[in-house]
């Protein structure tokens, strides 16, 4: 959630920033809400002052032995008015908060304006796409030929957009996961975390999925309001919800491997073949909790950590700075990493690394203590390090051989019992 003070006092500044996203707030509506809020608050304060003055007057009259019944009756009436005004003010503040929860984060000054992915800016490329001297297969054909990737079985078990991995491909996915976790924890300084795959609504509100994006989530039916996590970002970032952290503990850096569950609402007909877009997929997520003045530097570091995985695997990729219109709801700045997919002759997203500023922290009431008295909102960051299924398909396609076997990247061989290829 953006700073309510900005909405109250600088709505034009908010709109100027949101213009990069192609979003504009109704200035008159917000001005009207603020006028009503101020009027109700002023009315409540005046009534409270009148009641306090009346209470003193009643005390003085009783002390002198006089009759205070008329004033006491008035005080009772004022009390009823105060209750009504407080209810009205509370309802209005709730209305304002609900509207504010649906406003996306303000883009950083360095973020380009734009509508969609066509307006994103390529920052750099790494690696050269391999030139094959044979007709290549996509990962679906490779996996089915090997007998280790089954979509029909998954459809029988659950439905479309699910998959089953078996044998060497299952082991290769496990190897990728272990390699990512080992790199982030042993080399990059993250603390490994395993978390619940079910979260409550408060957690999803804290990171920004609720209330605006409920249709993208899987919600359990039952007495308790539980949701399957769309990303480990949700439970891990909420570690600091309602917490005040000592400044010397920052930054906090966590890496978590979880399955992720997404309804993919609005993506009907897109990427229906293969592992690109699944309802359930594994991901290693990086989360950082930092001081505000270091968050942009932390974004560069976190993105470099994701790039390091791709470089170690020898997978060509490019780094993209997202424009305002293509950024996620809670981000103030985002880099996407897109890996080369030979069968599609293009780059596809494999990691998204975002600085959320204090957007999530304000929702979560997550602060750090600067001194004995003063506290300030932390900044939160998250990024994929990496999406495991998409990394698997990238390895399969980029390392395929003419006979249909797949060479194992050198850094993964210790996790594969020393094997150099699978078939």
Swiss-Prot record:
Its EC number is 6.1.1.11. It comes from Acinetobacter baumannii (strain ACICU). ATP binds at residues 262-264, 349-352. Keywords: Aminoacyl-tRNA synthetase, ATP-binding, Cytoplasm, Ligase, Nucleotide-binding, Protein biosynthesis. Consists of two distinct domains, a catalytic core and a N-terminal extension that is involved in tRNA binding. L-serine binds at residues 231-233, 285, 384. GO terms for biological process: selenocysteine biosynthetic process; seryl-tRNA aminoacylation. GO terms for molecular function: ATP binding; serine-tRNA ligase activity. HAMAP family: Ser_tRNA_synth_type1. CDD domains: SerRS_core. It is an enzyme of class 6 (ligase). Pathway: Aminoacyl-tRNA biosynthesis; selenocysteinyl-tRNA(Sec) biosynthesis; L-seryl-tRNA(Sec) from L-serine and tRNA(Sec): step 1/1. The keyword Protein biosynthesis applies. Its main location: cytoplasm. It catalyses: tRNA(Ser) + L-serine + ATP = L-seryl-tRNA(Ser) + AMP + diphosphate + H(+); tRNA(Sec) + L-serine + ATP = L-seryl-tRNA(Sec) + AMP + diphosphate + H(+). This is Serine--tRNA ligase. Catalyzes the attachment of serine to tRNA(Ser). Is also able to aminoacylate tRNA(Sec) with serine, to form the misacylated tRNA L-seryl-tRNA(Sec), which will be further converted into selenocysteinyl-tRNA(Sec). InterPro entries: aa-tRNA-synt_IIb, aa-tRNA-synth_II, aa-tRNA-synth_II/BPL/LPL, Ser-tRNA-ligase_type_1, Ser-tRNA-synth_1_N, SerRS_1_N_sf, SerRS_core, tRNA-bd_arm. Homodimer. The tRNA molecule binds across the dimer. Gene3D superfamilies: Bira Bifunctional Protein, Domain 2, Serine-tRNA synthetase, tRNA binding domain. Belongs to the class-II aminoacyl-tRNA synthetase family. Type-1 seryl-tRNA synthetase subfamily. The gene is serS. It is found in: Cytoplasm. GO terms for cellular component: cytoplasm.
